[in-house]
Swiss-Prot record:
GTP-binding recorded as keyword: no
Entry's localization field: Nucleus
Alphabetical UniProt keywords: Developmental protein, Nucleus, Repressor, Transcription, Transcription regulation
Domain statement: The ripply homology domain is required for transcriptional repression. The WRPW motif is required for binding to TLE/GROUCHO proteins.
Name recorded for this polypeptide: Protein ripply1
Species classification: Eukaryota, Metazoa, Chordata, Craniata, Vertebrata
Record-level GO BP terms: embryonic pattern specification; negative regulation of DNA-templated transcription; negative regulation of transcription by RNA polymerase II; somite rostral/caudal axis specification; somite specification
Homology family: Belongs to the ripply family.
PANTHER family (alphabetical): PROTEIN RIPPLY-LIKE, PROTEIN RIPPLY1
Name of encoding gene: RIPPLY1
Stretches for region Disordered: 130-151
Biased composition annotated in UniProt, kind: Acidic residues: 132-151
Amino acid sequence: MDSAACAAAATPVPALALALAPDLAQAPLALPGLLSPSCLLSSGQEVNGSERGTCLWRPWLSSTNDSPRQMRKLVDLAAGGATAAEVTKAESKFHHPVRLFWPKSRSFDYLYSAGEILLQNFPVQATINLYEDSDSEEEEEDEEQEDEEEK
């Protein structure tokens, strides 16, 4: 099902609305896919033997219609006059979902200022995942020893 079919599947516009605003008769009043349950479930897979189209774009799912990823171009910094930071930001391509790994020992730093600075300097939609590092394991062992001493 393509986007035109999704638009056709949406509920029809009442005649009174068309009479009041004839210019709107040519454009749909609702977004395609919002009113059609078949478009809501679409991601290109087969469900109940019928192939669904792609009405909603999901960046984490690749489809056959996607163009191949372009290779990063080599940029001559001297000729372009751009700094390395500007080139990195302009030429970088991210594969979503982006996951940033943050040590559990620094989780309180994230809650206050360091996490805010991290997200300002990394301006893409990303998920921060906490991981066990040597510092956080030592803290857990210290807490366990303190608990044992209290008993």
